[in-house]
Amino acid sequence: MTNTTGKINLLGLTQPEMEQFFESIGEKRFRAGQVMKWIHHFGVDDFAAMTNVGKALREKLEASAEIRGPEVVSENISADGTRKWVVRVASGSCVETVYIPQNGRGTLCVSSQAGCALDCSFCSTGKQGFNSDLTSAEIIGQVWIANKSFGTVPAKIDRAITNVVMMGMGEPLLNFDNVVSAMQIMMDDLGYGISKRKVTLSTSGVVPMIDKLAEVIDVSLALSLHAPNDELRNQLVPINKKYPLDMLLAACKRYVAKLGEKRVLTIEYTLLKGVNDQPEHAEQMIALLADVPCKINLIPFNPFPFSGYERPSNNAIRRFQDLLHKAGHNVTVRTTRGDDIDAACGQLVGQVMDRTRRSERYIAVRQLGSEAQEPRAAANRN
């Protein structure tokens, strides 16, 4: 998977970057739109198949560029229709992409990193350690692979993929530039034309990057909350020690307010038996979210080996949901999908090569500080 050709991978370029590329090889900017449609609308990875592109330009493209997605290692289909792709990226690690069909829509859950540095105690991805950020081509390549698998082009109706959630392996905000570029392609009509309201980024709470996100792109935001107080969240989601709840929720409120249009924050809360599922936790959550425009998604824990956690009983789940409902919150309980192929929330593992030691997993968080990262060059998005 490593690019040893020196060619630029067009799969991960946004429209402005694609236009710059064509100018750099002495071509008109409009060629960007032609080629992007071939790549994203029709899943083409061979320049020779681009019939409205002249032979001379096709030869020039062959010499300087390529269209290269991640390598599909396996595809599994659950009894409930959920699909999971395991794909190998340039680092040699494998990451997972999940498609969930439900109620007339199709949601694609996309990974942003091979492994994860945040080490949330109830998440199987965190147990794998951290290997590498995915490039923008490797992120959008998951959408490209899934779209090709369904044999569809992104028409406005009857499309298989209607929603994309950055909720797969990794913390998206720790791979900021590549994730933003991939989401821009998802929403671009030359890409997949998905509505900004139907592209969702989920974060465990990298506060400086939440503020930066609001400056550069308009997508829906989800917060992996999982605990209603700092003491418990420090144990479950260790990044909370750096960005505690008051700081985190203030950033989320700023983000939602900046977008306007009656947008709300999605709160994700994994229910763990005897840990965060008691009535007092629901009451604390009600108080915590009193002034936060949000909807709440409760996620019963999906077991994985040696996790040390259990799924609450159905009665405990209903009790927790009812308490939140009575306080006026919009609350849903996520239906477990794809657990027979290990594709349920929190079960994504992949195969992370050269895993870092646990003590090293926080390097990215420690180095982040309060400064926004400088944009990376498009050449690093291969």
Swiss-Prot record:
Give a GO biological-process term.
tRNA methylation
Q: Where is the active site?
A: 96, 345
Q: List the disulfide bonds.
A: 109-345
Q: Name one GO molecular function term.
A: rRNA (adenine(2503)-C2-)-methyltransferase activity
Q: Any keyword Kinase?
A: no
What does this protein need as cofactor? [4Fe-4S] cluster
Task: Quote the PANTHER family the UniProt record gives.
Answer: 23S RRNA METHYLTRANSFERASE (PTHR30544), RADICAL SAM CORE DOMAIN-CONTAINING PROTEIN (PTHR30544:SF5)
Additional remarks: Reaction proceeds by a ping-pong mechanism involving intermediate methylation of a conserved cysteine residue.
Question: How is this protein named in the record?
Answer: Dual-specificity RNA methyltransferase RlmN
